[in-house]
Amino acid sequence: RALAGGANTFISVFHLHGTDLFMDFFNSIRDASRGAGAYTDRYVMYPPMANLLLWLASRLFPQEYLDTPGKYAGTWHYYPGAILAFLCLFAGVFLAFALVLLREPYSRKKRRALTVAVLFSLPFVFLYERGNTVFLALIFLVIFVQNYDSESKVAREAGLLSLAFAASLKLYPAIFGAVLLTDKRYKEAGRCVIYGILLLVL
């Protein structure tokens, strides 16, 4: 579609036609770099775990950029350090998601086709442009689904931890815990809730 319609068709996929490029990510990084001030000064709504990871990531960004007034948040492209930090973080998360998808129980050819189809689908391309932490949460949500019916107790527990971690980043993945209740796996649901509370509090 983009090849047929040209540049205007391509950028129409993105938020505000690409004029707010990657700003979910950069705004969040700038907010989280304030530490506790992210809540007291910036009034952010991200859960603590998400802000902790964003704060750690902010350590890679030039302090000069992080300290600029809010109206200059979109000037990240003037800072080579900010560009390189973003590219490295994005590449790491992208690779992690690809590796998780390649664990799907299909033939090698189907796994590769699935990975390419998912990672280059329209919703994911839009998600890349926003740079939102939902991408990271989705990785752990997929791990939960992959291990849900595993015969290994360790794998199932890893799945529960992954669901709890996903919920500690974005909250709404917690709704997938309803699957445990539907299958009457109450003990596992209880442990998942405990994991989630600990990750939210700690």
What are these regions (language model features)?
Residues 134, 141-157:
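Membrane-interface transmembrane helices that cradle and orient dolichyl/undecaprenyl
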Residues 95-105, 145-151, 181-186:
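Structural signal for the C-terminal ends of transmembrane alpha-helices
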Residues 88-93, 135-140, 166-172, 193:
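Membrane-embedded alpha-helical segments of multi-pass membrane proteins
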Residues 126-134:
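Short acidic/glycine- and proline-prone juxtamembrane loop motifs at membrane-interface regions
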Residues 114-119, 163, 167:
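Short helix- or helix-capping micro-motifs
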